[in-house]
Each structure stands twice: as C-alpha cells, then as structure tokens.
C-alpha cells in the first residue's frame, strides 16, 4: 500500500504541474499520514537534515565554478583548442563538441550546464556550416551527459552522501567509462560524417594552435588541480569544489580579465538560484527516502528480488532495467536519492561491488536525460538550438542506441570499469 501511495502522489503531483521537489514533499506527507506519524515539526527537521551534510557543500562551489567559467571566458577557450586541433576534419565541429563536452565535464559536473555551454557556442557554427542540425544537436546532448560521469560529478556527490560510499572512489571510477562514452560518440559521428559528406573547416596553422594552447592552458589546468588534489590527499572532494571556484575566479578576473565585478554579481545570483533548486530537491528527496525506509520498502523489494540474489548478473540486469525506466521519466537527482536506499542493500547482499553499482547507476540515469518522454538535457538543447523537441529526439536516437549498447557491455564486462579503477588507485 505504501508503494501505491508514494507512486500516486509522485505521479499525480507531476501531472498537475508541481515541481518534482514539491511532489516529493507531497509523497512524504502522504506516507507520514499513512504511517500515522504525521508531524509538521518532524517533517521540517528531516527536510533540514536532508541538506545538512558537509559533503553536499561541494555542490554550490562546483555550480559557482561552472557559472564563472561560462561568464569568464574559460568555456570559450576550452572549445577553441579542440577547434584548432580537429576542426579541419570532415565533420570536425562534431568532434570539437564531444571533446569540449568531456573537458567541460571535468570542470562543471552538471549535464545541463555542460550541454547549454557547448551548444551555445557550437550550434550556430554547425548551422552556418550546413550540418544536419538535428544530428548535431543529438551529438552535443549525448556529449553533455558525460558530465555526471567524469569527475567532479555532482550526481556522484549525491550518490556518495546517500549511500555512504567514498566520493573520491566514485570520482576515480567514473574516469574510464566517461572516456569510453566520449570515444564511442566520436566513432559514431565519424561514421555519420563519412555518409553525410559533411564539410570541413580551414586547418589551423601551428602558430594558431600554439596561441590557442597558451590561452587555454589556464582553463585546462583546472581539472588537473581538482583530480590531482583529492587523489593525492591534498584536499577532499568537498574542498576541491572551493578550490575550483577560487581558481576559476582568479583566472577569469586576473588572467583573462573578462569577468568584471558588476558581472560577478549576476554570476553569484545565478549560482545561488541553481544551488537552491538542487539543494531543495535533495532535501525533499531525503524526506521521502527516510519515510520509504520506515515503511520498509527496501525490505519489500529485497523480498521480491530475493530469488535472484544467487544469480548476481541476472539481478543486476533487472536492477538496471528498473533504473532505466525510472530515469526516463524522472530527473537524475531524485532517482538517485529515492532508489539508492532501496537497491543498495540488495546489491551488497548479491556481492556486487557497490562502487561499480554506483557508476552504472549514474551512467544509466544520465542516458535517461536524453531519452523521451522527459529528457531534461534534450529540452535544454532544444531551447538553445531553437529546435522542436521531436526533431531533437530523432537526432539523438543513434547516440542513445550506442550509449545503451555500451551500458550493456559494462554490465557483461564489469572489468571495463573495475580494472581501470584499480590502475588509478
């Protein structure tokens, strides 16, 4: 009965237009009433406790770093370097989009921010060069969802807080699959570029490449500082967020001199708005997650899937299919916060590596960001590119097939994720 109440309130809230955070609070209130423990004070305290975590402090800092990058010229220079290196290839702007998305992923950790920044710079150029715009938009959207995989990743931070797993290990485990996803997308684009006879840009001279490298080196040095810092133990992933924000601010104001103090105000306001949305969503989801645990839903799911525990791979396939279905209709953050406490005990009981499960969870949910009917990243890039949502769906379809095929490969060959993690550690 608790499951029915939760789903009805969640889907009903979304259907009448409530934001997902308020829908989750509605679920929490309904579950408290069903469990005969409704108390506004307890609900408010649980809501506050949901956001009261030192690890979550990394989120506003990484959001701020991303805003500074966009306003301070770092994003522009990150796109310019791969443009000079591979832009002259047939369909070169597509390769630039994926490479830039991967570099941006190592700086912002947000799929929506990554996609919006790259699309704003490249889509007009692709349109001017007569690229098929729906395929181009699909490629950039697919590249944008690498952001939650390559560190620093806001979803990994949220998963780490929700599961109690090491955020540093989750960060390290995301590097290899993130690179593989980028390589798979570029290989797919190479095949399409050959069939579509896409035009190429003028080849940059060695001098232009050198100037672009010198100009962009300050921006490219940021992921080295972040990953190297917490990998060496110099600072924690949470402290890495503060370091990233300070470094981005220093480069934007002192080195590039493109961020003025008047524009800094707007950057801070935008970062505060984005952070408030994310943190309120996290807090609201924690209320529902707490009540789900009290209602013993994890135990019910465990009992339901108990016969599959002796077949870990079959169990994992069922779990991945379940996450995929939920990820297609719900945003990444609430999916992580709601399903993690339900599925993680079962994963541990089946002796599936929790870090591997965490990486697969986020990859699966990330693909959901570019699949209908919701597709948050598709909605964002459709707005930026002034393209109909249906056209964006058709454009992204071949890349979704490739990424899902890669997900299946990761399921049957977990060593593709686990072995590189051992090398890195």
PLM region descriptions:
Residues 1-425:
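Alpha-helical transmembrane segments of multi-pass membrane transport proteins
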């Amino acid at each position: 009965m608790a499951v029915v109440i939760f789903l009805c309130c969640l889907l009903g809230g979304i259907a009448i237009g409530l934001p997902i955070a308020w829908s989750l609070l509605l679920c929490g209130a309904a579950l408290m009433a069903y469990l005969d423990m409704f108390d506004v004070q307890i609900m408010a305290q649980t809501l506050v406790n949901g956001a009261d975590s030192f690890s979550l402090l990394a989120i506003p800092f990484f959001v701020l770093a991303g805003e500074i990058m966009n306003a301070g010229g770092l994003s522009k220079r990150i796109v310019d370097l791969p443009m000079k290196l591979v832009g002259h290839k047939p369909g070169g702007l597509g390769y630039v989009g994926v490479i830039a998305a991967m570099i941006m992923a190592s700086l912002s950790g947000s799929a929506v921010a990554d996609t919006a920044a790259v699309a704003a710079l490249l889509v007009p150029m692709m349109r001017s060069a007569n690229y098929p715009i729906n395929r181009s938009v699909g490629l950039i959207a697919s590249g944008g969802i690498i952001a939650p995989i390559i560190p620093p990743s806001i979803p990994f931070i949220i998963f780490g807080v929700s599961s109690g797993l090491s955020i540093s290990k989750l960060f390290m485990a995301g590097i290899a699959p993130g690179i593989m996803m980028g390589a798979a997308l570029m290989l797919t684009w190479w095949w399409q570029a050959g069939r579509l006879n896409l035009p190429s840009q003028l080849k940059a001279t060695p001098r232009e490449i050198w100037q672009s490298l010198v100009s962009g080196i300050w921006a490219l040095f940021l992921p080295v500082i972040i990953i190297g810092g917490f990998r060496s133990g110099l600072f924690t992933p949470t402290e890495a967020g503060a370091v990233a924000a300070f470094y981005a601010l220093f480069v934007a104001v002192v080195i590039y001199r493109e961020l003025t103090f008047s524009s800094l105000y707007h950057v801070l306001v935008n970062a505060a708005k984005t952070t408030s949305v994310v943190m309120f969503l996290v807090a609201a989801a924690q209320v529902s997650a707490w009540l789900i645990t009290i209602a013993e839903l994890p135990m019910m799911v465990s009992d339901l899937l108990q016969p599959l525990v002796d077949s870990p791979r079959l169990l994992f396939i069922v779990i991945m299919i379940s996450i995929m279905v939920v990820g297609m209709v719900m945003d990444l953050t609430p999916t992580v916060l709601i399903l993690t406490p339900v599925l993680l005990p079962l994963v541990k009981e089946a002796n599936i590596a929790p870090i591997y499960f965490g990486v697969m969870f986020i990859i699966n949910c990330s693909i959901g960001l570019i699949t209908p009917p919701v597709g948050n990243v598709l909605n964002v890039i459709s707005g930026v590119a002034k393209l109909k949502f249906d056209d964006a769906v058709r454009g992204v379809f071949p890349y979704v097939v490739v990424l899902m095929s890669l997900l299946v490969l990761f399921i049957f060959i977990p060593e593709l994720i686990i072995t590189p993690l051992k090398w890195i550690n």
